[in-house]
Amino acid sequence: MPIVGNAGAGSVGAKPGSWLPEWKRIVVLLGSWTLGVRENEKGSGSRLIKWNGSGSREQKICKTTLPLFQACIKHLNSRDLLSTKVLTLALYKYILRAPQTAPHPPAAPPRTEVASSTAGRASRTKSASSTGRVSRANPASFHRPRLLRQAGLHLRRPRLSRQAGLRCHRLHLSAPSRSPTPPPNAVAPSSCSRLPRARLAIRGRRASSHSATVDTACSRRHSCDCLNRHRHLAVVATSAVAATTVAVPTACLCCGQIPLGRHRHNQAVTGRDLTVAALVLLAEVARETTGYSNGAPDPAAVVAISCCRPGSIPPSTAAAGSCRRHPAAVTARWPLAGGARSGRRDNPRRQGTGATRTGISKTYVSSVVAKTLALQELKGNIRVFCRVRPLLPNESGAVAYPKSGENLGRGIELTHNGQMYFFTFDKVFEQSTSQEDVFIEISHLVQSALDGYKVCIFAYGQTGSGKTYTMMGNPELHDQKGLIPRSLEQIFQTSQALISQGWKYKMQASMLEIYNEAICDLLATNHTTIQDGGASKYSIKHDANGNTHVSDLIIVDVLSINEVSSLLKRAAQSRSVGRTQMNEESSRSHCVFTLRFFGVNEGTDQQVQGVLNLIDLAGSERLNKSGATGDRLKETQAINKSLSCLSDVIFSIAKKEEHVPFRNSKLTYLLQPCLGGDSKTLMFVNLSPEVSSTGESICSLRFAARVNSCEIGIPRRQTQVRSLAQG
């Protein structure tokens, strides 16, 4: 792993004792080389001694910069968790640094700053007496590519900086002593195996342009998975100064890559030249941005605002952040370090040392909350999670997963007939993933139903791939509970906790199945299936607000989790299940569980209406494999037809056709608000890892990739203020 320091750039092959210009010295320690420091006899400098097994080489280093390099090496040696890519980038930026003599830092500075500047600045020369910088003699000899090759690095200058129009990028590697102190009961960030702590500051081309600084940290080992192509901590926020969106792209700390993007800020709206806009979410803004409206703390991932303009920022701006999985562990409060002062709105270049800059306090980012922000950033795309069931004892697997890089936790590979197929989704769960870990990824989506959103989660895949286990599981065993019972437990726990904040909820549950293109009520006491000669009397209707109603369907008011659990148990006994050659207990129908919320805040008279749809689709299967005959053959044909209609709908939405054939089947017509409305929709694609099912798995993954590309519109919250007549 490379370590950043300072030595002669032309030291390779240089004579011992040769003095190189200060601006041409770098320190590179690669591989297993060890660093030693020996003071010069005259006390004017030091020599770096590097051993590589075959001998040693001495490199001259300036005495004034020695403490900084010692602290850097000491710090980086203790931070073995840092990604090689991050360190390589840091070393590269240090080589491109403007030549200057570093001041005397403390003996062990808490943070090492690695900076870079453009080559244009290197062409300017100033006297050392007036500026404190060393004169840059013969700047043409400063050949960066040669320095990189001598350093053992073979990389190009990042094109990202030119694309972003940025002049300076600073990468701060925070030392453990200066890192945010974890709240009680939180796992130390240093114990995380994949997520180091880092800080990325992006500064614009001009002094009056905008900058952003975001501190990041990991609180739990399980919560550092990459999301949405290097957007693990990419935050789209609303400014507290004015209602202006500011995009702050940051480093993906799981893989170390830094996707720098354009930093946009609408000056026409604010009327201010913000130099620093490292804000993210205030509590009141988070309600509309992330869908959390039921009291504080709202899920504010980073709360820090700084501006070069005096009087722009309130002095006590602060907010709290919470993690839905470990609320006690990562809930914290981060006030700004220092308040804003009133003053003139002059150009920062003319303000000089008198310019007031509000300091940014320590910010503690919960990765779980960052995932919620990434979830809201998708502009209405259907989220797709992939889950692979475990292998049975007599099966051989054909599924692999990336072990590193940007697709870690998001990619899946299948080999079929000697050809490899690779797919990426928002999340991929391996065979060993537990039910609890799966639910954690969708818990925020379930929570948003209480805030007045329409939420739909459905499972898709071939028969025997684990759809019913994912959605329902075994409610009798805690570790095997599926998404439906876990979602209900969370909803009732949250609704009870919100009573103290003035919220009261009314909940109604219903459950139906679509069997052979006919709707059956699973909560009816005299349940009669189509195979017993019963006739379907239920019809689907959609109102003007996009809500779905099924005529004559039994809707039960539920007051506790026990009541809902008994309803689920009764519905499971009524569902159509059959045995095929591919599955001993194959679901022969599409099952839809619906929970409606009606909430009122007695203090603010605010009303919300939310809907949670949890759907377990029947599995697709090939007739030659299932061996279906008689009723099973008819069921298989009906299942495949409805899933084919679902595929037609998805293709029409993806192509943005004017007509979408929702009415071609009962399933697609029932899902119309979820697929073509303002709902938050998530699809699970379940796979069987065995070799014999690879063909069906590839078909499912292709369909899931098409679903993931569909834009169904931005989710809309159903809320209003209660009138006096209603009260």
Swiss-Prot record:
> Any idea which UniProt keywords this protein has?
ATP-binding, Microtubule, Motor protein, Nucleotide-binding
Q: Which Gene Ontology BP terms does the record give?
A: microtubule-based movement; spindle assembly
Q: Where is the composition biased (Polar residues)?
A: 114-133
CDD domains hit by this protein? KISc_C_terminal (cd01366)
Report residues binding ATP: 461-468
Q: Does the keyword Amino-acid biosynthesis apply?
A: no
* Ranges where the Kinesin motor domain occurs: 381-710
**InterPro entries for the chain:** Kinesin-like_fam, Kinesin_motor_CS, Kinesin_motor_dom, Kinesin_motor_dom_sf, P-loop_NTPase
- Molecular function as annotated in GO: ATP binding; ATP hydrolysis activity; microtubule binding; microtubule motor activity
Gene3D superfamilies registered for this protein in UniProt: Kinesin motor domain
On the tree of life, the source organism's domain of life is Eukaryota
Q: Give me the Gene Ontology terms describing cellular component.
A: cytoplasm; kinesin complex; microtubule
What's one Pfam family here?
Kinesin
Q: Give me the ranges of the annotated region Disordered.
A: 100-156, 172-194, 336-357
Q: Which family does it belong to?
A: Belongs to the TRAFAC class myosin-kinesin ATPase superfamily. Kinesin family. KIN-14 subfamily.
Q: What is this protein called?
A: Kinesin-like protein KIN-14G
Q: Which organism is it from?
A: Oryza sativa subsp. japonica
Upper classification of the source organism reads: Eukaryota, Viridiplantae, Streptophyta, Embryophyta, Tracheophyta
Gene name, Swiss-Prot/TrEMBL: KIN14G
